[in-house]
Amino acid sequence: MGGLTKFSSYFHSIFSRFPLITFSNPYPGENEDYKTKTVMYLTMWNSDLNSEALDVNSLQWQTWAKLNDPSIVFLNVSNHASPDEKVPFIQIESRKLVLNPSLLQYFLKDESTLQQISPWMSLLINQVETAILLTMYLDNENFSEIQKKWLPNMSWPLNIIKSIGLPSQIKRKICLQLNESTLDFDAILEDASKAFSALSELLGSDKWFFNNESPSFLDVSLFAHAEIINHLPLKNDQLKVVLGTHKNLTDLTTRVRTLAGYTSAGPIALR
């Protein structure tokens, strides 16, 4: 229980730095079409309501909103559209902005739920997401495929911006996160494999994590990470192979996709 309390305290310490912000001069600018609506700004999304965003965090919150608040309107933007350059974020009735670090607190207000999912979310954020970034951008063959088949599907100039200097930026980010000067690719992939094994064991034969009757945020987050892994155009796809060994996780992914009504991931038709 002490560990869960620490996770909860950690989330509160982060949230306290990023309160809900009301701007006297709203940013982005007011739009008459959405003046009374809540708008979620996504990145790497083609604006098709049945299509998945091609960014893990955008897909995660896009899916959560589709399942829990269908009234939310989605718009595609670049990271620079956000005051803190982190997407997604939401704008409420053209005035109040809820920035990315505050989304979890905004949508999940139940303390017990946060405590329950925190240790498992950390596996996805720290182990799996790190391995995704490494696989996409720091494997030369994979990055070549990403440049040809993934980034071009993004709007100009975002596709150009994303492809220039991105590997070195990602490497610095991961080194800083892991507090390492060099990266051990095999160790990072092994950590992701262990994370999937732990999540698979947690799910067991249940339909949703914690035997809930409907998808929790952990289910949605697992879905988002798994979808990106499954649809990335990679030559070296060890991460996809590892994920595929856990049938209960892939089945959960299919269930969430069906509930959310997705038929494509960017230009990729889903079957």
Swiss-Prot record:
Pfam families associated with the record: GST_C_6, GST_N_4
Subunit structure: Associates with the MINOS/MitOS complex.
Encoding gene per record: mtx1
Similarity comment: family membership: Belongs to the metaxin family.
Coiled-coil residue spans: none
Main location class: mitochondrion
Species for this entry: Schizosaccharomyces pombe (strain 972 / ATCC 24843)
Function, as annotated: Involved in transport of proteins into the mitochondrion.
InterPro entries for this protein: Glutathione-S-Trfase_C_sf, Metaxin_GST, Mito_Protein_Transport_Metaxin, Thioredoxin-like_fold
Location in the cell: Mitochondrion outer membrane
GO cellular component, one term: cytoplasm
Entry keyword set: Membrane, Mitochondrion, Mitochondrion outer membrane, Protein transport, Transport
Domain of life: Eukaryota
Name the record gives this protein: Metaxin-1
GO biological process, one term: protein insertion into mitochondrial outer membrane
Record flagged with keyword Ribonucleoprotein: no
